[in-house]
């Protein structure tokens, strides 16, 4: 066997230069071949790529290279999600301009990505912070504005008085801003929103068509959209207990069948009725203020202790006006959900039960499980939310839940309060319109002007883009655009009078909600898309990214595609045909005696008995080996891709990232695993060189017949070809790599046999070597190019078409059949695939297991189901 070592440091830059020179990854929009668009979620230019990037982009590259080899016109672009808060933080902390910081990071990360050997069309590269990109985003905003998909509305928002910006609910922790630590205020503010709720039902229904998306992602979106059918019920308020002017309280419920179990009403702290009550009661006012300080993220509200205060207001039961229900202000009701008010039926809702137990309001069960005695059915600490029959509900008693819901709806639809029905059937959605206003500098400017005379005036198309000024100062907190002395002051486009630009910028999720469409023709200077091109190249056939983007990014992109269709920018509804969410890259953590984390590069690990011992390389101090966690800077358990690529080569890193775990699961980083991948690279190199020496003696023409040895080599090669391709098509990359290893093992055995191979075997070895190189090319393209050249093949393997599978070679010569005696399995038998019935019968009856099962009884008949099963009847 050859002892020559493969030198990745020399090979990889050489082949990358050849690919660039030949422009083999550039995609032509007019290419007549069937298109295939593969896209990994583009990165934020933080400054360095991490191993998660390596895994993500390697997966996409395997798909791109495979589909290119199979004759598709592959679009595989790359760009930069370049706006965002970290650039402003860098400007504040390091006194560097956001633009300069961003583009320096892009240059560094691009260089890193290029060392990975990714088959990207860099000619289509753009950054979302470039005015040539956001010019078109501003144009689409104005188009959305014209058709009512963008609006300005007043919302109650979380305001950080130190950072002077609006915070999302998830950014408020224990009532304080996640970054500044300041107590967050609730402020009513003007906010630009996209009307995503207009498409709520369509976005929900279309999830059924996305059969190449993970079920968990579709479920997350389904829950986020949150469609519920129910009843809007208007409760009259007792005039004697209610502030002047308040006459009714509206609630939306999906369980109108439980109305007779109502024990309290709960309203949000910012509900108008709560505000009216607080104006006349200091205790209520104090409770409302305390609620404003709490976190507003749904997860935090769900886990917080349920608290409330009785307003003294009483609501009247819609079926019995003598039945008064106390109205509480509660910390678990949000104004933005439903009507900002609920009725509590504690017997059948755990949250409500916890609440009434705390305030001793009691509970009355109104749904009894089938078979349970209604008289003895009680609720104490655990609510019952199952099916059953109605009890303690007057005219509903004995009904099923479904029938009771219908009966309540019918009665309340015909009852009136004032001049309107008490009840109204409604479909409610949890989904809320998308607020896009951000009080930040480093984002896409919103292209509107505010005039005291004309109001909100769109920036004329001819004046786009509205470009961010570069001479900004971050000496003051808040939005640098607000402080700019000249940028925001402009004449009104309509009346010419004094006016001001909108100083809010767009949520960065807007930038990433249409970038996939821009990649189809990023050279179009006059429009966001070129209709015939975008409609031909979209949807993205395979999108790859983290599950953390399952809701917001993916849902916003689905909305944006519909909005772009409504405004004439493209002609389809769904942006991504296939979606794949890869797992994370995880690593052990290491902690010193003083509690500080140590990086893997600072730690030495040795085996000790049945375990392992870790020490610091510098000084030998013992280190605690901690749990395996996601790689993060805070835990210092990251591995620098540059170090791995510099030591082992990009192909080794790529192979390891694909081989160790199913791609949708986390991969545990292991230095031993990387070394194993490196050894396999060297083994393949030696193997191909050995095969190349044999191939030089092979006949040019295909032999007319093949002997057993040659046939075995060919069967293994074509079997691997079939299995590896199947794995890639299913994105089961680890399975494909296992089949490559399996084939390499059998091929290595064939190469190791002594003596000069026969002409037919030499021909088969040459064919198998070519197939082997093409099989690992998508995963290890640099090694594949070097091996391709060693085999004397013309051109580049990156341009070669996938080998044709000879299906007749996939048929096994023998087949294994299960054998039953009187319907009970007794064993298996392996026979020639073309064996006739008589031969199979004879072989079966000769089996010891069959003779023992018959125990001397005569054979009545033998039933042979061809290539399926044999049953002996005795």
Swiss-Prot record:
Entry's Gene Ontology cellular component terms: cytosol
GO molecular function terms attached to this record: aminoacyl-tRNA deacylase activity; ATP binding; leucine-tRNA ligase activity
Top EC class for this record: ligase
One matching Pfam family: Anticodon_1
Record's catalysed reaction(s): tRNA(Leu) + L-leucine + ATP = L-leucyl-tRNA(Leu) + AMP + diphosphate
Record carries keyword Isomerase: no
GO biological process: leucyl-tRNA aminoacylation
InterPro entries tied to this protein: aa-tRNA-synth_I_CS, aa-tRNA-synth_Ia, Leu-tRNA-ligase, Leu_tRNA-synth_edit, M/V/L/I-tRNA-synth_anticd-bd, Methionyl/Leucyl_tRNA_Synth, Rossmann-like_a/b/a_fold, tRNAsynth_Ia_anticodon-bd
Span(s) of short sequence motif 'KMSKS' region: 630-634
UniProt-listed Gene3D superfamilies: 2.20.28.290, 3.10.20.590, HUPs (3.40.50.620), Isoleucyl-tRNA Synthetase, Domain 1 (1.10.730.10)
Compartments where found: Cytoplasm
EC number: 6.1.1.4
Motif ('HIGH' region): 43-53
CDD domains: Anticodon_Ia_Leu_BEm, LeuRS_core
Keywords associated with the record: Aminoacyl-tRNA synthetase, ATP-binding, Cytoplasm, Ligase, Nucleotide-binding, Protein biosynthesis
Domain of life: Bacteria
Residue positions binding ATP: 633
Family (UniProt): Belongs to the class-I aminoacyl-tRNA synthetase family.
Name this polypeptide is given: Leucine--tRNA ligase
Gene field: leuS
